[in-house]
Structures are given as structure tokens and as C-alpha cells.
């Protein structure tokens, strides 16, 4: 166990607790990421295959391209996977691809060549993976990266390793590689429809939307890159039911924080959640405006009530709606 803590390598192979965790992987992910059943199913199947030991031993556990509009849960799913697989959200290495837009930024990834400044430090990506070989690597907004950066990714996806500037081999075989992109987001938010039939079959709708997105993706990425990815997953835009569930999760977090930090037992009524969805949701921007709405309408008002002395530490507080505003009763 001590060695496992030092090296960050789970020493025990598929033991009982991990097989139980893998069995429930899709259920665990569904608790955190709302309204993306297809994405969760595809992801958990590939991860189960990889962790059981059926994958190609020379390649990463899985490589995925997540496509979808902003705020639908692409990054959240990566965090949830890191926590479900390796037991900690910290085991996600996030690489923001907007930092790798220039040609010379390749050296930032694997380290500067000998004689250049920073040669001793190693690369930003290679060092992180070397120190944390069991992790989820998230390449955020992959379409922004320079073509030379893609060449490094091709090697990782194919051979499962890269050699850094100091000649050390960095092993990617125990990582899950996730790339996110907003390519084709317009086709997801505003799918092209023919005729007047509004109530269409959802599955047919999703298939058509996926085909439109894939057309755009094929123009944007090189075929040899797309060919090496295990699964390309298209995320759904969020509907009103999803929004309500997401607000429910966010309110749960506020309730937990109030209990832990202020010893306040806070009860948030359904009418409050409904009010936040009605006033704060925007389909184009997904779940992010909801977090802002929860902050401004619930957290800010609770903070003001605490400062004014209306609510004291250790109180039992109920949040409800009165005259289209959130009010607290003690």
C-alpha cells in the first residue's frame, strides 16, 4: 500500500472492490452527468474492456473524442471518470490546447531540446504522466492545437508511449485519453430538419444530428487522427428535465456546504429549483448559466441573510418562493 501511494500505481490487480466499481461504472457516472446516457454507455464499455485486460497491451486503456456544445458535461464526465476509475478527481491531467497553438509549443509538451532554456525541467505533459501513470488525460478544445501537436498525439494513440527531450520513455498504456471539441456544436443546437413534422423519433433525430456533426469533424481533423480514436461520442443538448436534475445536484452541494461550514440545515423546496430553471436556463449555453443562477439567487441571498443576522449559525432554514423571489424562513 505504501508503494502504491508513492508511485501512484494501483498495485492490486482487479481485486474485489475494483471489479465492483467497474460493474457500477455507468451508474456512478450517471449520478454526476445528467442526460448523456449514450456517452456514458460507450465510455464505460470501453473502460471495462481496457481494465479487465482485453485491450491491446501497447495502447492506452481508451481514447475518446467528445463532441458537443458548451456546458453539456464533456469536462464533467472526464472528472467523474477519473474519480470512478482511480478513486480521485485529482487523477485527471488537464491539458488546455489553446496553449499549444504555435509550432514551437510542441517543446512545451515533451520538453525543450538540449541547449535550450528549460531542458532540465522536462515537458508539461510528459512529466505529469511520468509521475502519475494511472490517470485520465483531458485534451481540452483539441481543434485549437497546432498540427505538429497532433503528430505527438498520433504516436501516443498508436504506440502508447512518447520519448521526452531527455530520452526517457513515458508510458501512456494505463491512461484514458479524452479529447473534447466544440466542432459541429451548431449542428447539435440547431439540427437541420425537413418538412413540418416536429414530433419526430428521438433516435432518428440523434442519428441525423450525429451525421451532420461527423461531416464537420472530418473536414477539421486529419483522417489518420480520427482513425486511431476508439470512440467518437456526440453529446446531446440538455432539455428541461435535465436542467431540473442539474439544479437539484447544485442545490445539494449548497446544502452540504451550509451544513459543513455553517452548521445550518438548509431545505430547498422544489419550487425554488423550478424558479431557478425558469429564470436562469439557456439551452445554447447548457448547464453553466444554471450555476451562475444558483450563485446569484440562492447563495448570495443566503450570504446577505447571514450578514444581516436574519439567519444564525446552527439554524434550520427553509428556502421557498414568495412573489417570484426566493425567501428564507427559519
What positions do the PLM features span?
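AAA+ P-loop NTPase nucleotide-binding core of proteostasis motors
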Residues: 1-330
Amino acid at each position: 500500500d505504501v508503494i502504491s501511494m508513492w508511485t501512484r500505481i494501483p498495485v492490486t490487480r482487479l481485486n474485489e472492490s475494483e471489479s465492483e466499481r467497474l460493474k457500477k461504472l455507468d451508474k456512478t457516472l450517471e449520478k454526476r452527468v445528467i442526460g448523456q446516457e449514450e456517452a456514458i454507455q460507450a465510455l464505460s464499455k470501453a473502460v471495462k474492456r481496457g481494465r479487465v485486460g482485453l485491450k491491446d497491451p501497447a495502447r492506452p486503456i481508451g481514447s475518446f473524442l467528445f463532441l458537443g456544445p458548451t456546458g453539456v458535461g464533456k469536462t464533467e464526465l472526464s472528472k467523474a471518470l477519473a474519480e470512478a476509475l482511480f478513486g480521485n478527481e485529482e487523477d485527471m491531467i488537464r491539458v488546455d490546447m489553446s496553449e499549444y497553438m504555435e509550432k514551437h509549443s510542441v517543446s512545451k509538451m515533451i520538453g525543450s531540446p538540449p541547449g535550450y532554456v528549460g531542458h532540465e525541467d522536462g515537458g508539461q505533459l510528459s512529466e505529469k504522466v511520468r509521475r502519475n501513470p494511472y490517470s485520465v488525460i483531458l485534451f481540452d478544445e483539441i481543434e485549437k492545437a497546432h498540427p505538429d501537436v497532433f503528430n505527438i498525439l498520433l504516436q501516443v494513440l498508436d504506440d502508447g508511449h512518447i520519448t521526452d527531450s531527455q530520452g526517457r520513455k513515458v508510458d501512456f498504456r494505463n491512461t484514458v485519453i479524452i479529447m473534447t471539441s466544440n466542432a459541429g456544436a451548431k449542428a447539435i443546437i440547431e439540427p437541420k430538419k425537413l418538412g413540418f413534422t416536429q414530433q419526430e423519433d428521438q433516435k432518428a433525430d440523434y442519428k441525423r444530428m450525429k451525421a451532420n456533426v461527423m461531416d464537420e469533424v472530418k473536414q477539421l481533423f486529419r483522417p489518420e487522427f480520427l482513425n486511431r480514436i476508439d470512440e467518437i461520442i456526440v453529446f446531446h443538448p440538455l432539455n428541461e428535465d435535465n436542467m431540473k436534475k442539474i439544479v437539484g445536484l447544485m442545490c445539494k452541494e449548497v446544502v452540504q456546504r451550509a451544513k459543513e461550514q455553517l452548521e445550518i440545515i438548509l431545505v430547498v423546496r422544489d419550487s425554488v429549483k423550478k424558479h431557478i430553471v425558469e429564470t436562469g436556463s439557456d439551452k445554447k449555453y447548457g448547464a453553466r448559466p444554471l450555476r451562475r443562477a444558483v450563485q446569484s439567487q440562492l447563495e448570495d441571498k443566503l450570504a446577505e441573510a447571514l450578514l444581516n443576522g436574519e439567519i444564525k449559525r446552527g439554524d434550520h432554514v427553509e428556502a421557498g418562493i414568495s412573489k417570484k423571489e426566493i425567501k428564507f424562513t427559519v
